[in-house]
Regions:
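Amphipathic alpha-helical transducer elements in NTP-driven molecular machines
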Residues: 6-10, 26, 37, 66-76, ...
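Amphipathic heptad-repeat alpha-helical coiled-coil/stalk segments that mediate oligomerization
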Residues: 210-225, 276-282, 292, 383-462, ...
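Charged catalytic and DNA/RNA-contacting regions of genome-maintenance
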Residues: 2-340, 349, 353-369, 373-465, ...
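Active-site phosphate-binding and catalytic loops of NTP-dependent enzymes
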Residues: 112-121, 260, 396-402, 461-473, ...
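Conserved catalytic alpha/beta cores of large enzymes that bind or transform nucleotide phosphates
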Residues: 173, 178-186, 518-551, 628, ...
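ATPase nucleotide-binding head domains, primarily ABC-like/P-loop NTPase cores
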Residues: 37-40, 239, 309-310, 317-320, ...
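Charged, surface-exposed helical/loop "interaction arms" that form contiguous linear patches used
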Residues: 370, 374, 387, 405, ...
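Terminal-proximal interaction/regulatory segments of ATP-powered molecular machines
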Residues: 481, 845-874
Length: 874
């Protein structure tokens, strides 16, 4: 794309485009943002815009398309959603006043992770930008991870030092679900992470150069942002990796944003052990924030619990659901706050009424910092400030320690409210384009300019009358023409009475015309009043935004407290509406639930009776409930409801039960349902086994594990053997609380064989060949699988089910008396597999698998095979 022989404007375009080759450049020309060449081709295709051409001084016309500047956000949103970056090039001066070429410059680069426009954001979901820095030290990988929401100013970071660092990174990405991820070059070798991002997220991945993570760059960036004593302030040790991730994120914001980086005032550090571990599979299976089918909110735990009044509360609720606590003290602080709000019905109602008038001040403050807030948005901040005394008072009145703490955290922001109320009219315009936002009496010059605009003739009449009185010239008059502007005309007979302060401008046959400094000043005011008024109002509004920006820390702290109060009040409201109870949460390791219900299904079945069920799990006699019963009887619902009840308790919510005692669980693992992973080339059985393997590797004695129909994707004996082995491994090596549903009735003998296993089944009532699911879980194994009866309920033709009964009777009659269910599993325990050669064990223990290259791993495998063959032959 040659830059010679082009018009000055296009030369300017090329110079700016050269600085932003990877972004689509929105180039402001008058009332449009125009795109040229490759940008135009891309935008016209993605946005379905008409592609035209522009004469740029060369022989060929430049491909061009454009969008109106007043509606550009809609088009920009579509491009950003498709993973493009957009550089906004603005006119930096009024074209009417420009001398020569209008000055233009990039004011922002908008990327998926740096969006602040409310029209492009979901009000109930954070929009995170992530930064990951990893480093290998002493033979082990470590990582620093940072997540920041530019639209709210929140920033969170953690240090990861897990044996499987890739899995740990995926867990954090799953927790925050960023829309854009900055990575360091070594991250390209973490195929599990890059595969997860590619297959399970829509995040844009931005590879940052090694230079972005240099020590000097990190130190300078952190000092500039947080002060020279940043390590002490933020609590980072000398060898911490988080600062590198934070600094890379901040530098990226400096590159893309002209303003607003100062919105990030601090970084909240957390340890991954602070929160319950929830794998991507578990989050999907439990349908916490979106359904598996349709990816909708309705039908999720978030849908059931969302009784919030503010956008800030909605985002925080989602965050709490995605990050359940594991500290019993912190959990009980939330529960006590919910109990206080639940009991104080009047205070709760008043609090929720006040919260209903609170706007999204987190995101409003960011737009104020960027200078892009509208007068109405600033007025909304003022209206929110006006509600803070009521919010603070009602929270304090409830008495719970956490509510008192949050009430104390609320700053009434009286000075901010005063500034807004003093400066802005009660009903400000949607934007500053036509002015009219500044309140009368706030600025004398604004008042004068408005008076001049609306009453300029009055000013002239008053001045004319005063001049007549001062000079004694009765017929002195003030006139106007396009050549001289305003002038004073005196007839020839009174020219001797004209004072020296009058300057003669024109001689007429009938008299003289004069001007005075005062008249010219008034002329300038009248003729330029509207333009100067707009400029002055813009300046005063900018000053107001600047004064509010100085209080961002106070506003942010208040917004955080208000959001927490909103969620807690919502929990109390949900408990009241849905008949929830306060759980007893401790570190006992016990999970005892009386008449538990599935929180989502009971809401979906409004008007129908949901059958409640009890659960008893502990670390001794009841570590594993082995659940049998027919398909469709409710096994999966029962298991999921227990997982959801535990999770609800640990976010501080009351739970759907008559009573609940929840010993804190550090993680919930689920293996339910069956599906192929076609993208990864894995069969249903392979997916199932991979997920089970991850559970067995990562579960601890404090975890809750949900396993549904393990082994059904292969042959009966293979599946049964795998299921039995999994149960044994969990009970003997992990000891965690487990709900294990199976269609292998032969496994029910494990109650006698393995300590901690208890048989339960879903009760079924049978009449003839018809069955009724009672949905009630009872002790003991199921007496039948009822497969044919379920097939009949599903609608199989009667001829098919009748024939199935005939075949079943034939098979049962011909089966040996020693049925599969009577298999001697004890005999399996007596079978000893050949011992692994000690030489092989020594080699395996000595090798560091993570340091091997693919070739080294292959050679090592051949060496092991050779050792094994020699041992067997020997």
């Amino acid at each position: 794309m040659a830059e010679q022989a082009v018009s000055p404007m296009m030369q300017q375009y090329f110079e700016i485009k050269k600085q932003h080759p990877n972004e689509i450049l929105f180039y402001r020309v008058g009332d449009f943002y125009e795109m040229f060449y490759d940008d135009a081709l891309t935008a016209s295709r993605e946005l379905e815009l008409t592609l035209t051409g522009k004469n740029c001084g060369k022989e060929e016309r430049a491909p061009m398309c454009g969008v109106p500047f007043h509606s550009y956000e809609t088009y920009m949103a579509r491009l950003v959603a498709k993973g493009y970056k957009v550089a906004i090039c603005e006119q930096m001066e009024d074209p009417a006043l420009a001398k020569g070429l209008v000055k233009r410059d990039i004011i922002r680069v908008v990327t998926p992770g740096t969006v602040i426009e409310s029209s492009m954001l979901s009000e109930d979901k954070n929009n995170y930008l992530a930064s990951i820095y990893c480093k290998r030290t002493r033979g082990r990988w470590r990582a620093g991870v940072c997540f920041a929401d530019v639209s709210t100013g929140e920033a969170y970071a953690t240090e990861l030092n897990a044996e499987k660092i890739g899995g740990a990174i995926i867990t954090e990405l799953c927790r925050y679900m960023p829309s854009e991820i900055l990575i360091c070059p070594p991250m390209l070798d973490f195929k599990d992470v890059t595969t997860y991002i590619k297959q399970h997220t829509n995040a844009l991945v931005e590879l940052r150069e090694d230079a972005c993570f240099k020590d000097a760059v990190m130190e300078q960036t952190m000092a500039d942002q947080f002060g020279a004593d940043w390590r002490t302030t933020l609590g980072y040790e000398k060898d911490a990796l988080v600062p590198y991730a934070v600094a890379a994120l901040l530098n990226y914001l400096h590159e893309t944003q002209k303003h607003g980086v100062e919105r990030i005032k601090t970084v909240q550090n957390y340890a991954d052990a602070q929160y319950m571990r929830l794998s991507p599979v578990t989050r999907a299976n439990l349908e916490l924030t979106e359904t598996m089918r349709g990816r909708e909110k309705r039908g999720t735990l978030l849908w059931v619990l969302d009784k919030t009044e503010t956008s800030m509360g909605k985002r925080l609720l989602r965050s709490w659901i995605e990050q359940p606590l594991v500290d019993a003290e912190a959990i009980n602080a939330r529960l006590c706050a919910v109990q206080a709000l639940y009991s104080a019905s009047i205070a709760r109602a008043d609090l929720k009424e006040a919260l209903g008038h609170v706007f999204d001040i987190e995101r409003l403050t960011t737009r104020i910092l960027y200078g892009s807030a509208t007068p109405r948005e600033v007025k909304a901040l003022g209206d929110t400030c006006a509600m803070l005394p009521q919010v603070k008072a009602q929270a304090a009145a409830c008495g719970a320690p956490l509510l008192t703490q949050l009430a104390d955290q609320i700053d009434l922001l009286e000075d901010v409210l005063q500034n807004i109320q003093t400066a802005l009219v009660d009903d400000p315009p949607a934007n500053m384009k036509d002015g009219g936002a500044i309140r009368a009496g706030f600025n004398s010059e604004v008042d004068e300019l408005r008076d001049i605009m609306h009453g300029g003739k009055g000013y002239l009449s008053n001045l004319e009358a005063r001049y007549r009185e001062e000079t004694g010239i009765p017929k002195l008059k003030i006139g106007f023409n396009k050549v001289f502007g305003y002038y004073i005309e005196v007839s020839r007979s009174y020219t001797d009475s004209v004072p020296d302060t009058f300057t003669r401008k024109q001689t007429l046959t009938t008299g003289e015309r004069y001007i005075t400094p005062e008249l010219k000043e008034l002329e300038n005011k009248i003729l330029g009043a509207n333009e100067r008024l707009l400029v002055l109002e813009h300046q005063l509004f900018a000053d107001l935004l600047s004064s509010i920006s100085a209080e961002v820390v106070r506003i942010q702290r208040t917004a955080s407290a208000v959001a927490q109060l909103d969620v807690l009040a919502g929990f109390a409201e949900a408990a009241l509406q849905n008949n929830y109870v306060m759980p007893n949460v401790d570190e006992s390791g016990v999970m005892e639930i009386k008449e538990g219900r599935h929180p989502v299904i009971e809401q979906m079945l409004k008007g129908s009776l949901f059958v409640p069920n009890d659960t008893m799990l502990d670390e001794d006699e009841n570590r594993m409930l082995l659940i049998t019963g027919p398909n469709m009887a409710g096994k999966s619902t029962y298991m999921r409801q227990n997982a959801l009840i535990a999770l609800m308790a640990q976010i501080g919510s009351f739970v759907p039960a008559a009573a609940a005692h929840i010993g804190v669980v550090d993680a919930i693992f689920t293996r339910v349902g069956a599906s192929d992973d076609l993208a990864a080339g894995q069969s249903t059985f392979m997916v199932e086994m991979t997920e089970v393997a991850e559970i067995l590797k990562n579960a601890t004695k404090d975890s809750l594990v949900i396993l549904d129909e393990i082994g059904r994707g292969t042959s009966t004996f293979d599946g049964m053997s795998i299921a039995r082995s999994v149960v044994e491994f969990i009970c003997e090596n992990i000891g965690c609380k487990t709900l294990f549903a199976t269609h292998y009735h032969e496994l029910t003998s494990m109650e006698q064989d393995i300590h901690g296993v208890k048989n339960y089944n879903i009760a079924v009532k049978k009449r003839g060949e018809d069955i009724t699911f009672l949905r009630r879980i009872v002790a003991g194994p199921a007496d039948d699988s009822y497969g044919i009866e379920v097939a009949k309920l599903a609608g199989l033709p009667g001829s098919v089910t009748r024939r199935a009964h005939e075949v079943l009777r034939t098979l049962e009659a011909s089966a040996p008396k020693n049925k599969v269910e009577q298999m001697d599993f004890d005999a399996l325990q007596e079978y000893n597999s050949p011992a692994v050669p000690s030489e092989m064990m020594e080699k395996l223990e000595a090798v560091d698998v993570e340091t091997l290259t693919p070739i080294e791993a292959l050679n090592f495998l051949y060496e092991l095979k050779k050792t094994l063959k020699g041992s067997l032959n020997g």
